[in-house]
């Protein structure tokens, strides 16, 4: 039987490049190679595409070939340059492990759409909406979902610090893994936080801090028949959750404890799962997403953010939540590819 050819993309130009490589390493180690034939496409930090033997920390130094994904639907694959000539490598389905800008904002999804190649994960629209936290909140609020109070600060805006009630969080509107995020406890800290966030995006979000515990829910599926993982819970000792920025995240977070399943009642976990599914549907997600929320003391659930391409590293939350629900990583990868092929 011919194996299904899966193009696995990783790396990229965003600040989450290294996280993406780690995700691809785990996907490569757990994909069923009897059923699938993986083709590994690494993208350098400067945006150069290369076909390589496998994802690893030093993948660029391995035997690589220049490669591009053709937008020609008839070609349905990759153009790979070998011995000064291009050859066509047919692709049946694409699995992007690209995180952050260009990876989960609709950009690469647009290229997949042009190429006619089915792909794992959310479409252009839902990817773009979920990448921009302000748009996420607008759509969610219209669906009756609670969100933090928020203000959008554009490139030339100079907000008056005294108008806010502190603490607030300042975030790049379109970034991930907590890059550029700062908690601001007083008015005199605001300008610095905004300038820090502007290193990652010209559009900034100021959010009113929300009390309660941080929880998350992994969602899998394309339609009404959605599968959810076990709810997880993040207990912060200080600062913000930023495991992907830490030196040795494989050894555990420096400032947080993640519990799966969350130390909550069955009723609370069930409400969180149902809310996650409601958010997923409202935003038009498909394939997969991790929905992060706050559970307040009064039982109210407030949306934090939606990650349409969550990490697949050994320490990432999405695969851990699914594993706790009985779906190990090899099965999860298989399900995602099958969902992509079904459309």
Curated annotation (Swiss-Prot):
It is a peripheral membrane protein. GO terms for molecular function: ATP binding; D-alanine-(R)-lactate ligase activity; D-alanine-D-alanine ligase activity; metal ion binding. Keywords: Antibiotic resistance, ATP-binding, Cell membrane, Cell shape, Cell wall biogenesis/degradation, Ligase, Magnesium, Manganese, Membrane, Metal-binding, Nucleotide-binding, Peptidoglycan synthesis, Plasmid. The keyword Manganese applies. Its main location: membrane. Its EC number is 6.1.2.1. The keyword Cell membrane applies. Substrate binds at residue 244. Its cofactor is Mg(2+); Mn(2+). One of its GO terms (cellular component) is plasma membrane. PROSITE patterns: ATP_GRASP, DALA_DALA_LIGASE_1, DALA_DALA_LIGASE_2. Disulfide bonds: none annotated. Induction: By vancomycin, mediated by VanS/VanR. It comes from the Bacteria. GO terms for biological process: cell wall organization; peptidoglycan biosynthetic process; regulation of cell shape; response to antibiotic. Mg(2+) 2 binds at residues 305, 307. Residues 137-338 form the ATP-grasp domain. It catalyses: (R)-lactate + D-alanine + ATP = D-alanyl-(R)-lactate + ADP + phosphate. Binds 2 magnesium or manganese ions per subunit. Belongs to the D-alanine--D-alanine ligase family. Required for high-level resistance to glycopeptide antibiotics. D-Ala--D-Ala ligase of altered specificity which catalyzes ester bond formation between D-Ala and various D-hydroxy acids; produces a peptidoglycan which does not terminate in D-alanine but in D-lactate, thus preventing vancomycin or teicoplanin binding. This is Vancomycin/teicoplanin A-type resistance protein VanA.
């Amino acid at each position: 039987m011919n194996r299904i050819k899966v193009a696995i993309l990783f790396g990229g130009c965003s600040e989450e490049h290294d996280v993406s490589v780690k995700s691809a390493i785990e996907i490569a180690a757990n994909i069923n190679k009897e059923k699938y034939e993986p083709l590994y496409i690494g993208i350098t930090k400067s945006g150069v595409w290369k076909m390589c033997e496998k994802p690893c920390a030093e993948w660029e130094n391995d035997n690589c070939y220049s490669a591009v994904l053709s937008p020609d639907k008839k070609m349905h694959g990759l153009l790979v340059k070998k011995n000064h000539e291009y050859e066509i490598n047919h692709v049946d389905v694409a699995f992007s492990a690209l995180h952050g800008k260009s990876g989960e904002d609709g950009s690469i999804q647009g290229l997949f759409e042009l190429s006619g190649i089915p792909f794992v994960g959310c479409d252009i629209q839902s990817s773009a909406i979920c990448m921009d936290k302000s748009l996420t909140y607008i759509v969610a609020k219209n669906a009756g979902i609670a969100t933090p109070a928020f203000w959008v600060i554009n490139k030339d805006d100079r907000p008056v610090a005294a108008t806010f009630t502190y603490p607030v969080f300042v975030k790049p509107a379109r970034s991930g893994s907590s890059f550029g995020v700062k908690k601001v406890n007083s008015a005199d800290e605001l300008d610095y936080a905004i300038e820090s966030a502007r290193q990652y995006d010209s559009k900034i979000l100021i959010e009113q801090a929300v009390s309660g515990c941080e929880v998350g829910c992994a969602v899998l599926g394309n339609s009404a028949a959605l599968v959810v993982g076990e709810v997880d819970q993040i207990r912060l000792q200080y600062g913000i959750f930023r495991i992907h920025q830490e030196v040795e995240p494989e050894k555990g977070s420096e400032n947080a404890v993640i519990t799966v399943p969350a130390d909550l009642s069955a009723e609370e976990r069930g409400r969180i799962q149902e809310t996650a599914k409601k958010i997923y549907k409202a935003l038009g997600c498909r394939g997969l997403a991790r929905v992060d929320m706050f559970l307040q003391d009064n039982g109210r659930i407030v949306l934090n953010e939606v990650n349409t391409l969550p990490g697949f590293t050994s320490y990432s939350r999405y695969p851990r939540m699914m594993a706790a629900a009985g779906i190990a990583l090899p099965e999860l990868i298989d399900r995602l590819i099958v969902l992509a092929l079904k459309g």
